Regions:
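Alpha/beta-hydrolase-fold serine-hydrolase catalytic core, especially in secreted/extracellular enzymes
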Residues: 1-90, 95-101, 108-114, 263, ...
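Aromatic-residue-lined binding/catalytic grooves and analogous aromatic/hydrophobic interfacial grooves
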Residues: 93-97, 183, 188, 267
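Cap/lid segment of the alpha/beta-hydrolase catalytic domain
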Residues: 111-195, 232-241
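Loop/turn elements at helix/coil->beta-strand transitions in domains of secreted/extracellular proteins
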Residues: 115-119, 133-136, 197-200, 221-225, ...
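Flexible loop/turn segments at secondary-structure boundaries
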Residues: 127-128, 145-148, 210-213, 233-238, ...
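Primarily recognizes the serine-hydrolase "nucleophile elbow" in alpha/beta-hydrolase
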Residues: 185-246, 272
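Mobile cap/lid helix-loop segments that gate and shape the active-site cleft of serine hydrolases
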Residues: 228-283, 304-312, 318-324
């Protein structure tokens, strides 16, 4: 793993901006809102609420050779009703085959009682493992709202429409926030569908799409299981704890790379990480008490596996306060920057455990070897319940 750099102790999430301490769950609810506001203002940029109008063109089901069904629903978001400008998004819904559904109902009693559990998969790839477990998969092609062009001053259809109709300075959102906003719009659609159980939604994505899944899931309690995979910098990885060769804030916000992903001005913290008012365990604490799983490769050096492990440890006290200590999870596998069958299997085990009470088939709470001891990372703890 090599040398681990600790720029500063990980900040205390239990201290309000005015210096007061969190003592109760009610205090945390207020502090949670404060943290969300700070993270958006400083790191990701502020984002608009739901559009004033959404038009939906429901696609026709296509029977697939393997017995599954697929359709494409076309959505048009109007930031301002009647303004004549909309933002298009296509969501691909895939339903499991009858054989897969029967097998899932046998394995998980209650499966499909109020509609099927569903996975919102950020990106265009098919999530085969979820379908085989009896989950509806909704593919969210986030690049329709905001392209992924390295080193460019990106402004995709979503941000451009809001700038034109609401005002150029109305929202400071970067690309990750724009993608998360689109994920929320996809969830708006999912919870309206009779095929889907709105109480059994999970979100996942890998790499930049893992950053999206984490931010979207942190801000939207309708995501009952949140799984960022290999999300690294601006995702589940710490800015303050870095393994040798891991992406840091300077690399992320370089004008030659992905500076457009974050809020304007966030690059000012590059090289001055010790002045950051937060670290990524604050973002992950917003998911609590809902189940949160990071899936990581031990050789995925650029994604900062040791920093992700450190941030996992620093998220735990919030889960402890909220009475859900086992819902904060992490899983490491051998290998590099990929979204593997092993990752998917652990994620779906957690979904089955959450939605159907199935036992976990593995221990997803293993801290990466070489992670600095907790007392080197932070000294604060959850208030006593």
């Amino acid at each position: 793993m090599g040398e681990v750099t600790i720029h500063a102790p990980l900040p205390d999430p239990f201290r309000f901006d005015d210096g007061r301490s969190v003592h109760t769950v009610a205090d945390w609810d207020a502090r949670r809102e404060e943290i969300a506001t700070r993270l958006l203002a400083v790191q990701y940029g502020t984002m608009p609420p739901a559009p004033e109008e959404t038009r939906v063109e429901t696609g026709s089901w296509e029977a697939l050779p393997d017995g599954r069904r697929r359709r494409v629903d076309r959505l048009q978001f109007a930031p301002v009703r009647g303004a004549g400008r909309t933002i298009p998004l296509e969501l691909t819904l895939t339903c499991p085959s009858g054989v897969e559904l029967a097998r899932s109902a046998e394995r998980c009693p209650g499966h499909g009682t109020n509609g099927l559990p569903a996975v919102l998969y950020v990106g265009r790839k098919t999530h085969e493992a979820a379908l085989s477990r009896g989950y509806v998969v909704v593919n969210y092609p986030n690049d329709m709202l905001e392209p992924m062009e390295i080193g460019q001053a990106i402004r995709g259809p979503a941000r451009a429409a809001y700038a034109a109709l609401v005002g150029d300075d109305a929202f400071s959102w970067g690309s990750i926030a724009a993608w998360a906003w689109g994920a929320h719009r996809a969830i708006d659609h999912m919870v309206s569908l009779p095929e889907i159980d709105a109480a059994q939604l999970a979100i996942t994505g890998h790499s930049r799409n893992g950053k999206t899944a984490l931010l979207a899931g942190a801000l939207d309690p309708r995501c009952q299981v949140v799984n960022p995979a290999g999300s690294g910098c601006a995702g589940a990885g710490s800015y303050l704890v870095l393994g040798a060769g891991s992406e840091d804030l300077a690399a992320l916000t370089s004008r030659e790379r992905w500076w457009a992903w974050t809020a304007p001005g966030f690059e000012a913290f590059a090289g001055h990480e010790d002045t950051l008012p937060f670290d990524q365990h604050w973002l992950m604490a917003l998911v609590a008490p809902r189940p949160l799983l990071r899936t990581e490769g031990t050789q995925d050096t650029w994604a900062n596996p040791v920093g992700t492990s450190a941030a996992f440890l620093a998220t735990q006290p919030v889960y402890d306060l909220l009475g859900a200590p086992e819902a904060n999870t992490i899983h490491y596998r051998s290998g590099g920057h990929d979204h593997t069958e092993e990752d998917a299997g652990v994620f779906l085990d957690l979904c089955d455990a959450t939605f159907f009470g199935k036992p976990m088939l593995n221990d997803p709470a293993r801290v990466l070897d070489g992670t600095p001891a907790r007392e080197r990372l932070f000294e604060w703890d959850a208030p006593r319940r």
